[in-house]
Amino acid sequence: MKKNYISALAVLACVAVFCTISGNSFHQMRTATEEIIPGEGVTEVRMLSDYFPDLAGTAGDTQIYVLQGEQEGGSCLILGGTHANELGGHMGAVLFVENAKVEAGTLYVIPRTNNSAFTHNDPQEGHPSTVHITTDEGNVREFIHGSRATNPVDQWPDPDVYVNYMGQSLSGSEN
C-alpha cells in the first residue's frame, strides 16, 4: 500500500512540474509585447481606452500612435494586426509608426488592433510564437506571431455551436 502512495506522489510531482513549466510558457505569451520604436513623426501615444474607458486594463486595450502634421488637413486611420498571424498588416503599421512624417492632417496608427490575438497562437498549426528580423545595423528585432482569432480566454464562454439568422450551424469560434 505504501508503494502506491509513493508512486502517486511521484506522478503528482511530475504533473505539477509539467503544469508549472507549461503554465509559465502560456503566461509569458500572454504578457509579452514587442518593442515598437516611435519615430520622430509620432506626436502622441494614446490608449484605445481613452476613447472607451471600459477597455482599460483588458486585452482589448491597445496603443494608438498619433502623427500630427503642422498644417491642418484630413485624418486617416491605419489598422495593423487585425489578424495577428498575418504579419504584413502588423509590420506595415509598425513601419508607419517608426518612419512616417505627416506634413498636413493627422494619422492615427494602431499596430495591434486585435491586441488579444497577440497573446496566443495556433500551436497545432505549427506556427512560431515569434518572428526575428535582422536590421541593416545587425540588430535582431523580435515580433510576436499570434493567432487570427481573439484569445479564447478573453471571450469565454464561447458557444460550441452557433446558429446564425439563416439557421446554419457554425462552430462557436467562427463567428
Predicted regions and their residues:
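Structured catalytic-domain cores with a bias toward divalent-metal coordination
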Residues: 2-175
